[in-house]
Amino acid sequence: MTSLPGGIYDGDLGDQPMSGLVPMVVEQTTRGERAYDIFSRLLKERIVFIGTPINDQIANLTVAQLLYLASESSEKPINLYINSPGGVIYSGLGVYDTMQYIGAPVSTICVGLAASMGSVLLAAGEDDSRACLPNSRVMIHQPMGGAEGQASDIEIQAEEIMWLKERLYEILALHTGQDIDQIEADADRNYWMSAEEAEEYGLVDNVLNPDNLEGLKSIQPNGEAADDSEDDA
């Protein structure tokens, strides 16, 4: 049996604790009341939230939301909030590639934790639109995984995880401006950073304290969707 390369989360990636705990939001419109789950309501404001470990299910939902918002407007920013310990690298790379592919700029904001693949997605946001809240924690490290079976199968899996490691380091170097050798040295073990240290490292551009929110409107809810809600069918 081979485990997919991933991050620090050691639970079942198929068991998402948020399921069944999604609150509903009720809005008053000229046509009566309308109820949304909270994530659909945030989507109307062009906000996408990754708040769990990243697996195929979460990645597919995130990709679908990004594609939908990009089809609605290729110019208005999308705000991607991240509170994730990471997860399956292949799933995360699907989200990463979508962020780079769509025309709409994607702002990224770390709320709580962006570790492993979560830190890669955080760094992959639009230039000057990547941020952490003050008490966020960010962590980079090399891929984790394991393999069982014949020696040839283990060798194949080892080659694959080495390729993934090199590719992730290239992505981090691209978005942080750090030298690949420096990233490789830092990521050899879990490399934890505060919000300020993540900014200094180049993973984000700002730490969102109350005194520096002015001018960062690209990562603020735009409120336009709320104005349009009464005109919806």
Swiss-Prot record:
PROSITE patterns recorded for this chain? CLP_PROTEASE_HIS, CLP_PROTEASE_SER
Q: Which UniProt keywords apply?
A: Cytoplasm, Hydrolase, Protease, Serine protease
| Superkingdom, taxonomy of origin | Bacteria
Does this UniProt record's set of keywords contain Hydrolase?
Answer: yes
Gene Ontology CC annotation, any one: cytoplasm
Q: Where is this region: Disordered?
A: 214-233
Where is the protein localized? Answer: Cytoplasm
- Matching Pfam families, A to Z? CLP_protease (PF00574)
**Record carries keyword rRNA processing:** no
A Gene Ontology annotation in the biological process aspect, one of them, is: protein quality control for misfolded or incompletely synthesized proteins
E.C. number: 3.4.21.92
The catalytic activity, as recorded, is: Hydrolysis of proteins to small peptides in the presence of ATP and magnesium. alpha-casein is the usual test substrate. In the absence of ATP, only oligopeptides shorter than five residues are hydrolyzed (such as succinyl-Leu-Tyr-|-NHMec, and Leu-Tyr-Leu-|-Tyr-Trp, in which cleavage of the -Tyr-|-Leu- and -Tyr-|-Trp bonds also occurs)
GO MF annotations for this entry?
Answer: ATP-dependent peptidase activity; ATPase binding; serine-type endopeptidase activity
Q: Which InterPro entries match?
A: ClpP, ClpP/crotonase-like_dom_sf, ClpP/TepA, ClpP_His_AS, ClpP_Ser_AS
Q: Which family is it part of?
A: Belongs to the peptidase S14 family.
Protein function? Cleaves peptides in various proteins in a process that requires ATP hydrolysis. Has a chymotrypsin-like activity. Plays a major role in the degradation of misfolded proteins.
> What is this protein's name?
ATP-dependent Clp protease proteolytic subunit 2
Q: Provide the species name.
A: Salinibacter ruber (strain DSM 13855 / M31)
